[in-house]
């Protein structure tokens, strides 16, 4: 898939994330890259056949102090190749992108892996409604 088409799917997936999460995002950009680098996979101790779909780079909201500011935006990296290879069709790809975005946005908010897993379970796998998920 070409990059503009993939970026449109990213926009579609982002639009499907509960509004309260989207509205709480500030000074963060979503960047699409082809693949995670071998160095990054090594640093994160990820070995084939496992791979990385996304990565949050920045300072979680819970770690910011009163003087935090004048910084470059935090970044959520999405890796197009692994996401595409893991999805059979565009609808599956939008879901995979959405799950990855939710996970990385959770890191932005300073959530633990357990908290992120609960949100993923309730929203993506369990069908909880938006108000239930975002409180």
Q: What does each model-found stretch correspond to?
A:
Residues 99-108:
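Active-site recognition of the HExxH zinc-binding catalytic motif
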Residues 1-95, 108-135:
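Metalloprotease/metallohydrolase-associated module, dominated by Zn2+-dependent proteases
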